Amino acid sequence: MAKDIITGRKTVFGNKRSKALNSVRRSWKPNLQKVRILVDGKPKRVWVSARALKSGKVKRV
């Protein structure tokens, strides 16, 4: 399962509830992008969330 190396975001599981409160398992997936960034001074392809990219927490190479 892919995981954001900056924020640690990953797939979350829970229940979808109908009006009658029936439950069905479902998952919420983060918007992960595979990008090249500098990790320890070297370029590396890693999974980063779109939120981390937009907020400027990480810089593309």
Swiss-Prot record:
Gene3D superfamilies: Ribosomal protein L28/L24. One of its GO terms (cellular component) is ribosome. One of its GO terms (biological process) is translation. Keywords: Ribonucleoprotein, Ribosomal protein. GO terms for molecular function: structural constituent of ribosome. Belongs to the bacterial ribosomal protein bL28 family. This is Large ribosomal subunit protein bL28. It comes from Lactobacillus johnsonii (strain CNCM I-12250 / La1 / NCC 533).
